[in-house]
Amino acid sequence: MARSKLLKADVLSVNCPSRQILDHISSTWGSLILVVLLERTFRFSELRNKIEGISEKMLAQTLQTLEQDGFVLRKAYPVIPPKVEYSLTPMGKSVAKHMQELTLWIEKNLAQITENQKKSSKKTKQN
C-alpha cells in the first residue's frame, strides 16, 4: 500500500495550497456562511435570506468551494420540488468556531475600529 506524500504547509509561501484554503474560509462570504452554519442545518434559500447582500450566484459558488474543501456537507433529497440542505462537517465546525470568535471580536471592537478609521480619514484629508 502506497503512503500518501504529506504536504508541508506554509501559508506564507505563494505556491502553497494552504493560501487558497485561507482565502476560501476568510473571504467575506466564506466566513459568514461558516458562522451561520454553526447554528444549524440550512436550505439554500434560508442561507440567502439570512446572509444579507449575498447573490444567489455567489452563495452557490461559495457553498460549492467550501464543500470541495471538506468544510460543508451538501445533502440533496430525491423529492419534487428539489430539497437541498447544507451543514458543517466536523472539520467545518472546527474552523467555523474560529471564524465565529473573529466575528464576535470584530463586533465587540467595532466602535473603536470605526473611530480609528475616522481619525485616519481626517488625517489623510488634511495632508
Label for each model-derived stretch:
Residues 39, 80, 94:
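Glycine-/small-residue-rich active-site loops that bind phosphorylated ligands and cofactors
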Residues 48, 76, 99:
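Short, flexible helix/strand-to-coil boundary loops that buttress conserved ligand/catalytic motifs
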Residues 67-87:
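Beta-hairpin "wing" of winged helix-turn-helix
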Residues 1-14, 68, 73, 90, ...:
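C-terminal regulatory/oligomerization modules of transcriptional regulators
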Residues 12-58, 85:
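N-terminal helix-turn-helix DNA-binding core of bacterial DNA-binding proteins
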